[in-house]
């Protein structure tokens, strides 16, 4: 890859991983539309590591509190709001982890296309708009229960389809289940930590067992740029939804989806 491609793809991953607009779609499109070469497995791992570091650092207080309470819940302290949240994050991760392993190859073979991205971008954009407009938005993150967490986890599994958006579909589910915007977003971000970690570990093992050439300077640049852009993105996103809701991202998804359809039919 050229230096321009490295910079663009790393920034795309960072900026889109936590926005409800689908990072996978934005990484697939340059190769499908611009003819760029595939970024390769090692680069995929690098940019996911960057975004993982960003979300862990941004939510470091919450992560520390949840982990501490979760481990202490096995002892005399018993169950607390934070320990329960830890269990809900684990429960919400299971569907995507299982289905990801089972369906990964089939999805990559049949669904990694610009047409699929165009359609899913529009459909799930409209669902996000509906959830934002019609959801009661009264529940906080600590009012989750196991049923809510499992439903959001099942929604996260749907995000394996390119164009869906992991953060978008989990926030949509959270809003439809009555969560307020900040809580739906924060749970979505916390839910990203184990799933991105497992994805990174899976691909790292695949990378180690395979015959892949590794350019460490490229990987380091990918980690740094995706980390910086993801951190800024999380901060800005939480500010935007507080003032404007999900509408800007719905509009973007609709414009992108329609634009892709027009482009593909010309």
Swiss-Prot record:
GO terms for cellular component: plasma membrane. It is a multi-pass membrane protein. Keywords: Antibiotic resistance, Cell inner membrane, Cell membrane, Cell shape, Cell wall biogenesis/degradation, Hydrolase, Membrane, Peptidoglycan synthesis, Transmembrane, Transmembrane helix. It catalyses: di-trans,octa-cis-undecaprenyl diphosphate + H2O = di-trans,octa-cis-undecaprenyl phosphate + phosphate + H(+). The keyword Cell inner membrane applies. The chain crosses the membrane at residues 1-21, 39-59, 83-103, 113-133, 141-161, 189-209, 218-238, 244-264. One of its GO terms (molecular function) is undecaprenyl-diphosphatase activity. Pfam families: BacA. It is found in: Cell inner membrane. GO terms for biological process: cell wall organization; peptidoglycan biosynthetic process; regulation of cell shape; response to antibiotic. Belongs to the UppP family. NCBIfam families: PRK00281.2-4, undec_PP_bacA. PANTHER family: UNDECAPRENYL-DIPHOSPHATASE (PTHR30622:SF4). Catalyzes the dephosphorylation of undecaprenyl diphosphate (UPP). Confers resistance to bacitracin. This is Undecaprenyl-diphosphatase 1. It comes from Pseudoalteromonas translucida (strain TAC 125).
